[in-house]
Design a protein with these regions (language model features):
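N-terminal export leaders
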Residues: 1, 6-11
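N-terminal signal peptide c-region/cleavage motif recognized by signal peptidases
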Residues: 17-23
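Acidic, serine/threonine-rich low-complexity disordered tracts
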Residues: 24-117, 122-126, 132-220
């Protein structure tokens, strides 16, 4: 997702990940799988879910699949629909390839990108290149906190960012309160606050969208 400010770029930045299991180059290397399902709320009202599945061994290649589906309703009428699916391949903490397809209330966007040697090339929708290691908005990866640029999977733009600590605060996850540590992603639009448990697991996200409305992710 691009950084929040306008609804589409925000949701774009928030949504970026894949669903294929990567085969490790090292046959004896353990392969692990992690999965996250987030309940998504707009101004406290549930609008859908965003699911992530990460497969593979970090030392070889990992694949992340991200699937989101949101519907915003008023008086039972669907005013806005959003669907997003992204598949990312990772080598260590660097993005090796990305393919994303987004339907933002009827407007469809496809993004594809690939790392080639020391260069990262975005081939669609608009060609763009960057040198060195590039990450997407990979909230699950602790290396995100040290980045100064991130790939927006909906627009295909590589965005300059600044990431700062927020400290600790209680976070409501369903009926329980969890001690959470936050990090804020500053970018071209409104900031995104990302929350982690004491064990370092990604458990939540807060951002402002159109009209000052608050979009929240909470781990289920």
């Amino acid at each position: 997702m691009a950084l929040p400010g306008r609804r589409a770029p925000l949701i774009a930045a928030l949504c970026v990940w894949p669903l294929a299991v990567a085969a490790s180059d090292a046959p004896n290397e353990p392969v692990s799988t992690s999965a996250w399902t987030f309940r998504v709320l707009l101004d406290g009202q549930p609008i859908g879910e965003h699911r992530f599945r990460l497969s593979g061994a970090r030392e070889a290649e990992r694949t992340l699949v991200s699937e989101a589906q949101f519907t915003v309703r008023w008086l039972g009428i669907a005013l806005y629909r959003y669907q997003h699916r992204a598949v990312e391949r990772w080598r260590g903490d660097c993005l090796a390839a990305l393919s994303a397809d987004t339907d933002d209330n009827g407007t469809r966007t496809q993004v594809s990108a690939q790392a080639q040697d020391a260069q990262f090339d975005v081939t669609a929708p608009v060609p763009q290149s960057a040198r060195g290691c590039v990450m997407s908005f990979a909230y699950w990866n602790p290396a995100l906190r040290t980045q100064q640029r991130l790939l927006n999977p909906q627009t295909g733009r590589i965005e300059p960012v600044r990431i700062t600590p927020l400290g600790e605060t209680p976070l409501e996850l369903g009926a329980r309160s969890v001690a959470a540590t936050g990090w804020r992603i500053h970018g071209p639009a409104q900031p995104i606050d990302v929350w982690y448990s004491a064990q370092g697991d990604w458990i939540g996200l807060d951002a402002r969208v159109d009209g000052g409305r608050v979009l929240r992710y909470r781990l289920q």
